[in-house]
Every structure is written in C-alpha cells, then in structure tokens.
Amino acid sequence: MNSRQIAVNPMRLKRTRYRYETSGQWYKGSLHLHTVSSDGHLTLDELIQKYSEEKFDFISVTDHWCLPKLNGNRRGWPLLVLNGVELDGYDHLGSYYHVLAVGASLKPPLFNGNFLKTLRTAYSQGAILIWAHPYWTGNSLQEGIRHKFHGLEIYNHSSQCENGSGYALFHWDGMLNHNPDFLGFATDDSHFIPEQPYWKGGWIMVNAADCTQQEILENIRRGNFYSTQGPEFKTIEFGENSVSVETSAVTYVRLIGPRRTGRWVHALGRHPNFQAEFDLSRDWPYARLEIEDA
C-alpha cells in the first residue's frame, strides 16, 4: 500500500459530544517500543536518542512484563518518557492477547505471569489499556469486546512490515459500533533487531497545553489526539452540525460513519493547507475522520 493514512478518533454524535479541543500544541509521540530489558536491541538511553533525533516529544517504553527504569534521569532526557509495559497471556476462555498498559504504575511483585490479574490491576490503577496488533495476534472482534480495553492499535508498523498484518480498521469499526468512545492508535512496535529494523512508521499527535506526563496522559485518555503515518491535521473544529478540518497536503479527506456510511472530498492539487468541511448525521452513533496523502 503506497498511501499514508491517518485516522482521527471518533466523535460520539447521538449524545452530541465532540472529542477534540485543539487550542493547545500538537506533540508527537510513540507508544510501543522495546529495549534490551525485553526483546529489543537498544538500551533505554539509545532509544531515547533515536526518537529525539526524529523530533518526537514523548515515548512510552513498553517492554514485555517489565517497567522501564526511569530513576532520576527524566530531567536530563530530551523528551518525555511515560511508564509503560506490554502484557501478554490467555484469558479465562483461552484467548491469547497482547496489551499495552500506558501510564502504568504497577510494582514488580505484581508481574507474576498472571495475565488477567495484572490486566485488572493496571485498569484499576488508571493505566490506558491498548489492545495490541489484534490482526497479527489473530484476535476476533468478540475477543476485543470481552475486556475493558480503552483502545486498540489500528496500525502496528512492525506487524505490517513483517507479514502485512499491521492494520486493524475492521476491528476498530466493530469496536466503535459497540463502544463509540473506543480509541485508535498507530504505533511502531520497534525492536531495532537486524530482522526487524522498522521504526518511524506510525505515531500519535496529542493536543495538549504542555508536554508533561499529566497533560499527555489526560489528553490521550480523552482521545484528544490523532494517529498518523505522516499526514497532518492542523485544526479540527466543530459547528452545530458540522466538522471542518485543515490538513497538510493530502489527496483524500473522508468522514467515516458506521458500516457503509460516509462522505469524502478528493483534494485535487494537493494544497499545503487543505481545508474541508462535512455535515454530521445525527443518526450515526459515531464518526471518524481519515486523510490520505498519496
């Protein structure tokens, strides 16, 4: 697939609650990364250096069953590092999952391999639970509905490069029909091992007043971010029954509703500041925006 896409988190329509408030600044972040503490090949400091050189403002290191050691180094780092961990295991019905817990404050004694117990503890402590690469893992929609995930990876760059299983838009639309507040994330899942050198392929842009742990996590929880492989939203604004956007140079802007509903604009000429406006249907339980630049 040659095009690069981005997806904006859904706007719940029947209750007239629009998700976005974009008066702050946009901050670039990557939420699924691994170091030598699990199955990655870079140290935490090396990983931070890589992502800071690419103008990332924050990252979440999500090693398998291992919280990053952030002791006292935060002030000297060129970007914000959020606590995170990747959990994996089987649930009570025998289904297998990978789940990111971003903003986790779990203590090491809880990492005893009990997947469901640790997942519930992370949820109770306020971690953002992200259903990781469901297509790659082979999860069904019903397996996602079964647990209290806050969102899922709609794009995982490592899975896409490895065997073409990185996209999970079918899972996302199914989850949105079940829960219109369900969030969509684009991630790298970077390891920096010779057979998996992939990175810089998927990230999120969070709109926040400042790049602090509290501000970033709060706005991720609210869904005040978009996921991207490159194209940019500059503004997202709402009228009484409409949404208008300004974007980077794109070829398509789409408003996507449930099942086969939706609207689109073909952006001929690829203006560097393209603008589009859509009427919103009150009959839709949710709508999401998508732009494409090639």
Range-by-range predicted roles:
Residues 1-26, 179, 190-294:
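C-terminal functional module detector
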Residues 6-132, 136-148, 153-174, 178, ...:
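A metal-dependent hydrolase metal-coordination microenvironment
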